[in-house]
UniProtKB/Swiss-Prot annotation:
GO terms for molecular function: ATP binding; phosphoribosylamine-glycine ligase activity; phosphoribosylformylglycinamidine cyclo-ligase activity. This is Phosphoribosylformylglycinamidine cyclo-ligase. GO terms for cellular component: cytosol. Pathway: Purine metabolism; IMP biosynthesis via de novo pathway; 5-amino-1-(5-phospho-D-ribosyl)imidazole from N(2)-formyl-N(1)-(5-phospho-D-ribosyl)glycinamide: step 2/2. Its main location: cytoplasm. Keywords: ATP-binding, Cytoplasm, Ligase, Nucleotide-binding, Purine biosynthesis. The gene is purM. It comes from Prochlorococcus marinus (strain MIT 9301). It comes from the Bacteria. GO terms for biological process: 'de novo' IMP biosynthetic process; adenine biosynthetic process. It is found in: Cytoplasm. It is an enzyme of class 6 (ligase).
Length: 347
């Protein structure tokens, strides 16, 4: 018995690397010394642009969205999701992404499927001037089923230590600006999949309500906010804190980026929750608290700023085609008039 008979096709793996090479190398900046094919990717750190350069790293996956996306052939889109989940995390520190690495594990290498995944990863990187420096594709028969794959991503960025955004400058009455999400993004899909299992006509019912394709809306790739944030920082707009709204929703993620003696007060009437979320809530009979603590509800990213920068930020977001609005403000925890986060729903 040889290795191929056991389920691992070394030759197919070599062919796959050859097929993805063009997509990967299209993302390479002048700082890439050596990328795909070697034992390690080599990247020249652009330290001349920084007084005290700090590297910022992040790693993430796409979660159980992969299960649904694979069943509906949304392979390119989950590649973008992978980049977004990592990149949106590191930019909250004010970092500029430098390079990205991916890990793909599968039961049996399907070159056509996984080429689309890598093309999606390359697209996400290329749109944000981030080099796809390398990765690993592991064929693991018996561990993963034949037609399934899992993804993990790793993003590294750079920021000047003096320009780190860490929430320490947040103060009372600072404004919270919301940037609209692209949909469900990559969180809450264990619940979504359960709702779908219990409603076998859910796609047709959604189309009656919205006149939109259910799976096209549900599986839209996660929005990447890097370019619009970079534009703000390049115009010397002071952002005191940022939050990527992922698992746990606004209630879990927004407080993470501010000092413990403050709380974010959110005006829940400042935006309309998108139809898709309300539809899922109804079909799944989701309790209000779980609804807010599971989904982003149309808010993908939040900024905390001094009010003097509000108009400039809203204008830049408009230029980048991103809806944005003032969603709330920062208050002290001991403020007797506002004692709870999202008081309308969490009492």
């Amino acid at each position: 018995m040889d290795y191929k008979t056991s389920g691992v096709d070394i030759e197919a793996g070599r062919e796959f690397v050859s097929e993805i090479k063009q997509a990967v190398e299209a993302t390479h900046t002048s700082n890439v010394i050596e990328g795909i094919g070697g034992f390690g990717g080599l990247f020249r750190i652009p330290i001349d642009s920084f007084k005290k350069p700090v590297l910022v790293s992040g790693t993430d996956g796409v979660g159980t969205k992969l299960e649904l996306a694979q069943s509906k052939n949304f392979h390119f889109e989950v590649g973008i999701d992978l980049v977004a989940m990592c990149m949106n995390d590191i930019i909250t520190s004010g970092a500029r992404p430098l390079f990205f690495l991916d890990y793909i594990a599968t039961g049996k290498l399907d070159k056509k499927q996984l080429l689309r995944v890598v093309q999606g990863i390359s697209h996400g990187c290329g749109e944000n001037n981030c080099s796809l420096l390398g990765g690993e594709t592991a064929e693991m028969p018996g561990f993963y089923s034949k037609n399934k794959y899992d993804l993990a991503g790793f993003c590294v960025g750079i920021v000047d230590e003096d320009k780190l955004i860490n929430g320490k400058k947040v103060s009372e009455n600072d404004l919270i600006i919301a940037l609209k999400s692209n949909g469900v993004h990559s969180n809450g899909f264990s619940l979504v999949r359960k709702i779908i299992q219990n409603n076998n006509q859910i796609d047709k019912e959604f189309e009656k309500v919205s006149h939109l394709n259910f799976y096209d809306e549900l599986l839209k790739p996660t929005k990447i906010y890097n370019n619009v944030i970079n534009q703000m920082l390049s115009e010397d707009i002071e952002i005191k804190a940022m939050s990527h709204i992922t698992g746990g929703g606004i209630p879990e993620n927004l407080p993470r980026c501010i000092p413990s003696d403050f709380i974010p007060y959110i005006n829940t009437s400042s935006w309309q929750i998108p139809t898709l979320f309300k539809f899922l809530k109804e079909k799944g009979s989701i309790p209000e608290r779980d609804f807010w603590n599971t989904f982003n509800l149309g808010v993908g990213f939040c900024l905390i700023i001094d009010k003097q920068f509000k108009d400039a930020i809203l204008s830049i977001c408009k230029d980048y085609g991103i809806d944005s609005w003032e969603i709330g403000k920062i208050v002290r925890k001991n403020d007797s008039t506002i004692s709870k986060f999202l008081p309308e729903i969490l009492t």
